[in-house]
Amino acid sequence: MGGRGCARAGRAVSSPCPFLAASGAQHIRSVGEILRPQSAKMSIPRHRPHQRVRLFADAASVWRYVHARTVARVLPRLRRRVPDRSDECRRFLQRVVQSRPQFSILQIGAFDGVSNDPVHDLIRTFPHVRAVLLEPQPAPYAALQRLWHDDPRVAPIQAALAADCGGRPLYVVAESHSHLHPFAGQVASFSRAHVETACRRYMWRPSADAIASVAVTTVDWRTLVDRYGRFDLVVIDAEGFDGEIVHLIDLADHPPDIIVYEHCHLTRRMRRRCSSRLRRAGYVVREFNKTDTLAARRHLGIPS
């Protein structure tokens, strides 16, 4: 019990036992020598209450950090995981195309005919396929024409599907801000809110001039059917406007057998509305990956 007064609170204290007191003091001196810096370069920085440690350079750095953490960790946990059945969907489409002597495709939002295009391979592989490709933007439409100019089976049209024939503004990323978005050319929608959301993914507080509007020609469903006949497959990629286009298709008079559209940009309410409308019309609806939905007639035997 005599060692209680040897060392307390980091300093030697007088003790009735001289040996313990001396050894304790020696121990403290040795530890102090170990922790003592050997040179000025190895000096241990001391915390000063008046100094603040800055982890981020500015508010933009804070936003980027929070955004990255949210997207990478929180959102995947909240979303319902959908297995990727893209290969099954591709084989299903090929099987249906092969089983018919003629097959007609309508693609809404064809862009340049190559980028993320599910129709391109079908046209190249099967000679009995004919396609009508709608693309309202001037530059992608020009690329579409160059791609299919020597194929009489393909009809590119510079127009967008809408409720009536005429024109309306299409919102795109402005040319002055296109270098800030890696896929600026593919972000075009009748919904300005969708383009704003797409800009915020790569821009910090995009200004109003980051979004521009382009006047485009529109065509309705009835005009397309009267001119080109019934379509077997309709592929929709309208950047957030897919739900409205699903409701523009006349499912009572000459309905298509297969409809493929993007659900990733739709609200949950719009997803339910599209699925309910298609099921009431006799379609089987399947989300075959995290971005796309396939709706097909029951007799076609859609993969479950």
What are these regions (language model features)?
Residues R11, S15, Q26-S304:
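Phosphate/nucleotide-binding beta-alpha loop and adjacent structural elements of enzyme active sites
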Residues M1-C6:
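Intrinsically disordered, glycine-rich low-complexity segments
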